[in-house]
Regions:
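Catalytic domains of carbohydrate-active enzymes that cleave complex glycans
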Residues: 453-454, 458, 474-572
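Extracellular "leader-to-stem" segments immediately downstream of a signal peptide or signal-anchor
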Residues: 2-131, 136-351, 523-572
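Right-handed parallel beta-helix
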Residues: 147, 156, 199-224, 260-287, 293, 301, 334-345, 368-379, ...
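Extracellular beta-strand solenoid repeats
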Residues: 129, 136, 142, 151, ...
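Short, glycine/acidic-rich beta->alpha junctions
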Residues: 108-112, 133, 141-142, 232, ...
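Generic beta-strand/beta-sheet core signal
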Residues: 131, 153, 257, 311, ...
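Glycine-rich beta-solenoid repeat tracts in large extracellular/virion proteins
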Residues: 140-144, 157-172, 182-184, 188-195, ...
Length: 572
């Protein structure tokens, strides 16, 4: 992404006969039996439907200690509204045809769609309906108001056909870290969900060539004020003691801000405080150190005296030297979404690596409790993006067409998101020289995200440096032919508590799949036999990684099959 990554081919592919046939059959296995264990069964450590499968010791340990387990993160509340399967269906308040849109494939409908979305925002939210057919868009479609959902007639019936890229529409976008890279290689979308004021300030900065930070506290990370300081607390706590609750109410969306100290003990803690963190050279990882303070959006659920209860357990310990505090933020998009459509970019060749023009798909930025459902992106440089987005759900999404740089990306401190029932199709044209394929990306201290029930006909589990931590990939079938990226100054590939659970690797390549030799305090559980070839990594930290490997060499044997679904049954 914003990185001096090694250039080269899209990665080796070997050992797979009739790739679509193998992956298609695996998809049936991968989606046939989710656990969804109720609390009593899950707590017992024996999920229903275990059948002939094997419950590993690690799962039994976890059920006794779900919120503070050393290797497995608690992600049972990831996703929109705590991962609720119930999807609200706001009433239709606007039809784009009433604002001038025509599904004839030739009329530029972007202005009409945006007028309808703005009208829905002024009405306080609701659904904006798109008709079946093909609607040409010559501009960015902007979902900029909370409670507004853009809904087509289904991904097989409604097509938005884009004609222009983000470099043309917004302007060239350089990297805040220097060099000649295009930030459209990892940012922005032709359907862009972001609060209006934040989007305006971001694009104005790009136009002025003042390359911005992209997250919750503005272009210079200075748009916040303290609501309360927080007393020391342990990871996994749901309730914290604060200095003052006069400005806190149930339902408030706040930021937990946690700063690093001169010895980088916060970064060491994110890596698990293992033996190698003390000798690791943090000071020269200037890109990584620019990512702190860690900013974690969360809703307040209860306020009693000076005790504040949160909707999710703390992601980290809170220590006095890290100056933990609850703060305001620059604004959020909440309760918004996109459903039932295909976004199709022109089928033009990919640009060289890190020089994307910005034929990008759907991006959620400074978004919370938002949802994308039944959406396909075709011929995109970058498919679906989470940029400083938290507690969002992407379900039934698909990346298809001529191939992409990042089919999915999750960066700039994105947390607690759920990407489920996703597909990365095999590319329809060969990869041009000097391009690179990643896969399902995570970076930039992003944490507690879940990728669940996926089929990847190409790509890899792209831990893209920037030390993401506590992320889960579960019940996924993958032809592991992509490569990870990441600048050396962005630091480690992995922080603590990465979990790869019930993974089928159809071409037998180990890289970024089996991570017990790479990722500190990690868990690799229920993966078939793999071997090292193509891109081969070494651990960032010396000494014992305290990683776990269980049920290695098995296929669909681990129970529960899906780590996220099983954790849904474990609550407070």
């Amino acid at each position: 992404m914003s990185h001096d990554e090694s250039r080269g081919s899209a990665g080796g592919y070997a050992g797979s006969v009739s790739r679509r046939g193998v992956l298609g059959g695996a998809a049936v296995v991968a989606t046939s039996a989710m656990t969804g264990a109720p609390p009593a069964a899950a707590a017992s450590g024996t999920p229903p439907g275990a059948g002939s499968g094997v419950v590993p010791p690690l799962w039994r340990e976890f059920t006794r200690n779900p919120f503070t387990h050393p290797q497995l993160p608690f992600v049972g509340r990831a996703g929109c509204r705590g991962g609720s399967a119930r999807q609200t269906r706001p009433r239709v308040v606007a039809d784009v045809r009433d604002f001038g849109a025509v599904a004839d494939g030739t009329t530029d409908c972007a202005p009409a769609i945006n007028r309808a979305l703005a009208a829905a925002g002024r009405a306080g939210g609701g659904t904006v309906a798109l008709p079946p057919g093909t609607l040409r868009i010559d501009g960015i479609v902007r979902v900029a108001h909370s409670g507004v959902v853009l809904r087509g007639a289904g991904s097989h019936r409604t097509v938005l056909r884009a004609t222009r890229h983000l470099t043309d529409l917004v302007g060239p976008y350089g990297s805040r870290y220097g060099g000649d890279k295009s930030s459209w290689s990892w940012a922005g979308g032709l359907i862009w969900l972001a609060p209006e004021a934040r989007w305006n300030s971001l694009t104005e900065a790009i136009g002025a060539k003042q390359w911005p930070f992209e997250g919750w506290t503005g272009n210079r990370r200075d748009e916040w004020r303290t609501l309360a300081t927080v007393s020391p607390a342990r990871r996994g706590s749901w309730t914290v003691r604060v200095s003052d609750t006069s400005r806190l109410r149930p339902g408030d969306l706040v930021l937990l801000r946690v700063a690093d100290d001169a010895d980088h003990t916060l970064l060491a803690h994110m890596a698990g405080d293992g033996p190698g963190t003390g000798s690791y050279s943090w000071d020269d990882k200037t890109k990584l150190t620019s990512y702190v303070p860690y900013e974690w959006p969360v809703r307040v659920t209860e306020v009693h005296g000076r005790r504040v209860t949160l909707e999710r357990p703390l992601p980290l310990d809170l220590r006095p030297e890290w100056d933990p505090r609850l703060t305001t933020h620059a604004g959020a998009l909440t309760g918004a979404g996109v459903e039932g459509l295909t976004l199709e970019a022109p089928e033009v060749p990919q640009q060289p690596h890190l020089l994307d023009l910005g034929y990008n798909g759907v991006v959620l930025q400074c978004a919370y409790d938002c949802r994308v459902d039944d959406v396909t992106v075709r011929n995109a440089d970058n498919g679906f993006g989470l940029v400083a987005a938290s507690a969002c759900t992407l379900s039934r999404t698909r990346v298809a067409g001529r191939g992409s740089h990042h089919p999915y990306f999750c960066r700039e401190g994105s947390h607690d998101n759920l990407i489920e029932d996703f597909t990365v199709e095999e590319r329809t044209t060969p990869a041009p020289a000097d391009t690179q394929l990643h896969g399902i990306n995570v970076e930039g201290l992003s944490s507690y995200n879940v990728w669940s029930r996926g089929v990847m006909e190409m790509g890899t589990f792209d831990s893209h440096r920037g030390m993401p931590f506590a992320n889960v990939r579960t019940e996924i079938t993958v032809d592991n032919n992509g490569r990870h990226g990441g600048d050396a100054s962005a630091g480690p590939l992995f922080g603590a508590r990465f979990a790869h659970w019930n993974i089928r690797v159809t071409n037998g390549r180990a890289g970024l799949m089996r991570i017990d030799g790479l990722a500190p305090w990690s868990a690799t559980v229920g993966i078939n036999e793999v071997r090292e070839f193509d891109q081969i990594d070494v651990p960032d930290f010396t000494g014992d990684l305290n990683a776990r490997l269980e049920l290695y060499g098995t296929t669909d044997a681990v129970r529960p099959r899906n780590l996220y679904e099983a954790q849904r049954g474990l609550g407070r």
